[in-house]
């Protein structure tokens, strides 16, 4: 299991929610009782401080510990924790100003699997998806689920804007419910933007006025082209800009 987050001036945005999600994942795997959440929080900040970082990218990984090679979890009750903090490097400014391209790929999410909602180091599907999108000349991959509905991107959640309303695939679509996704859903009503979690079809994506993706590292990026076709007017839209500004104000980024 792992969490990935960014710190702003030494403060990790919604670290408590990242750790709560980590705890839920640990419970799913039967190792939650051995998890010291308050100790992990202290360790994250100690790692940031030791590396003398203010704006940082953090990866916290927890395993069930050391054991014999098998399909059974170690029973020692002693978890292994690895924390990596490095300088936060965001995509180039033009990616935010002009948007990026995406392609719908064959690599898929499984909405029936409980693993879809668990943040882990199992990135093989995402690696395949990103490779397929690169082959198509795009920077990001849009992944469908086994029902042919839009799920998420390779390492990010996806939103569409249609007639001024905001939509994002529901958790039941086979997504990892991101902390930034959660923040956007909370911010939208305060901006007068109606937001809904629902099934999103490929046609909805193609007909959208705007599309944006989110995660804790990139924050919010506009998608302006899908499978070689412009999305909306082919440039970042006003709803995306308003949400991005509100998110930066929230994080202090």
Question: Where would I find each of the regions flagged by the language model?
Answer:
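Conserved alpha/beta cores of soluble small-molecule-handling proteins
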Residues: 4-142, 146-149, 172, 185-253
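Glycine- and Gly-Pro-enriched alpha-helical subdomains that act as flexible
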Residues: 141-142, 149-171, 177
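Feature captures the catalytic cores and cofactor-binding loops of soluble hydro-lyases/lyases
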Residues: 178-183
